[in-house]
Amino acid sequence: MKGIISQVMGPVVDVDFKDYLPKINEAIEVKYDVEGIQKRLVLEVAAHLGDNKVRTIAMDMSDGLRRGLEAEALGAPISVPVGKKVLGRIFNVTGDLIDEGEPEDFETRWSIHRDPPSFEDQSTKSEIFETGIKVVDLLAPYAKGGKVGLFGGAGVGKTVIIMELIHNVAFKHNGYSVFAGVGERTREGNDLYNEMKESGVLDKVALTYGQMNEPPGARNRIALTGLTMAEYFRDELGLDVLMFIDNIFRFSQSGSEMSALLGRIPSAVGYQPTLASEMGKLQERITSTKKGSITSVQAVYVPADDLTDPAPATVFAHLDATTVLNRSIAEKGIYPAVDPLNSTSRMLDPQIVGEEHYKIARGVQAVLQKYKDLQDIIAILGMDELSEEDKLVVERARKIEKYLSQPFFVAEVFTGSPGKYISLEDTIAGFKGILEGKYDDLPENAFYMVGSIDEVLAKAEKMKA
């Protein structure tokens, strides 16, 4: 059905139809030329203004758009390519390839607006998703089909952890990943693509980008584009998929811009009144079903470090685990720079992970906490003033700190050390030995940047020689 553009206000476009009213979320296509260049713009219906007038949000820049242009309602929401052919490619919000690679014919396309799995389809089992990263698996394990918040400032290693997870899912779980770049820097998107190419994980991941310079419609809907691709892998191929959203805050931010442009009355701190329901709609689709699972890792930017800001606060309600990266740990040269005392997980429960895992994780945290409490005394009076018992705690804590570091596969290029994947059993056994004092006689440095405890012993032997 054809309509006519009647008003253009930046990313908001009004379209008049004759004897037809497109549904909410239906896609409308406009083809026009600007200075001889053919352009195609996709609009999405956001509001009905009358019996045959709709207000839409543009999915790309509306430069050159003018009143009186013809617009065609496509009769369905935006649909994007799905299936194995999307791996190794970069897409925009409407499912067009933007990596300047070979054009591709995609047989299957799915709508980006989908219902979450029904109660009957959802899996209720609490299972751990093994990542092969010691600090994560031991202290803040991820739930299969769960949601993880990744917190950290600039340059502490968020991207490296994301790439390592993609690598481990690809090579150890034989699974696929989807990365949605939501309102982040174009340079970061480019770097990520090139780094993935270099580290050999690109053909196991689909990338969808809606960057900072794009209109709010594209930045908001790009999360749904990526999620739709992940849902296909889960529902049709029965796989366990990893879904990365960087950054989930920008999803709320772009929703707030759209809401203001559509003339809705703002809510707390200027956010959209529908913030919680929009977030819920997205997060409810990320879950385990009886066929497969989508486990998501979402980078969370906290504006002005205010955790009570409505955007991050709304995200917290959905998270099963948090992985907090700490600059002071990165400064010690310990990577991944995960904060062992501030990272949390609802999976760290004796009924889920078992009594032994729980005890050792809590034991490790207790030793690290005691060390933290003693640091002021050490700084003022020195180690010699501590009791023998406290000295032992400090020695073990330093070994634990070092042993929480590990060489990554994707960082081989700049560390020169081969990457390590450590199974949960080996991780538990290693830390159990440290807590029980089995390795009290080994030098601290033997624990730094190694995989399993056997490597610590081998390294200690080498150091003796």
UniProtKB/Swiss-Prot annotation:
Protein name: ATP synthase subunit beta
Record keywords, A-Z: ATP synthesis, ATP-binding, Cell inner membrane, Cell membrane, CF(1), Hydrogen ion transport, Ion transport, Membrane, Nucleotide-binding, Translocase, Transport
EC number annotated for this UniProt entry: 7.1.2.2
Gene3D superfamilies listed in its UniProt record: 2.40.10.170, Bovine Mitochondrial F1-atpase, Atp Synthase Beta Chain, Chain D, domain 3, P-loop containing nucleotide triphosphate hydrolases
Family the entry assigns: Belongs to the ATPase alpha/beta chains family.
Keyword check for DNA damage: no
Family annotation (Pfam families): ATP-synt_ab, ATP-synt_ab_N, ATP-synt_VA_C
SUPFAM superfamilies: C-terminal domain of alpha and beta subunits of F1 ATP synthase, N-terminal domain of alpha and beta subunits of F1 ATP synthase, P-loop containing nucleoside triphosphate hydrolases
Assembly and binders: F-type ATPases have 2 components, CF(1) - the catalytic core - and CF(0) - the membrane proton channel. CF(1) has five subunits: alpha(3), beta(3), gamma(1), delta(1), epsilon(1). CF(0) has three main subunits: a(1), b(2) and c(9-12). The alpha and beta chains form an alternating ring which encloses part of the gamma chain. CF(1) is attached to CF(0) by a central stalk formed by the gamma and epsilon chains, while a peripheral stalk is formed by the delta and b chains.
Domain of life of the native organism: Bacteria
Regions that span the bilayer: none
Catalytic activity: ATP + H2O + 4 H(+)(in) = ADP + phosphate + 5 H(+)(out)
Gene: atpD
Localization of this protein: Cell inner membrane
GO function terms (MF aspect): ATP binding; ATP hydrolysis activity; proton-transporting ATP synthase activity, rotational mechanism
Gene Ontology CC entries for this record: plasma membrane; proton-transporting ATP synthase complex
InterPro entries from the UniProt entry: AAA+_ATPase (IPR003593), ATP-synt_VA_C (IPR055190), ATP_synth_F1_bsu (IPR005722), ATPase_a/bsu_AS (IPR020003), ATPase_alpha/beta_chains (IPR050053), ATPase_F1/V1/A1_a/bsu_N (IPR004100), ATPase_F1/V1/A1_a/bsu_N_sf (IPR036121), ATPase_F1/V1/A1_a/bsu_nucl-bd (IPR000194)
SMART domains (alphabetical): AAA
Residues annotated as binding ATP: 152-159
Topology with respect to the bilayer: Peripheral membrane protein
Primary role: Produces ATP from ADP in the presence of a proton gradient across the membrane. The catalytic sites are hosted primarily by the beta subunits.
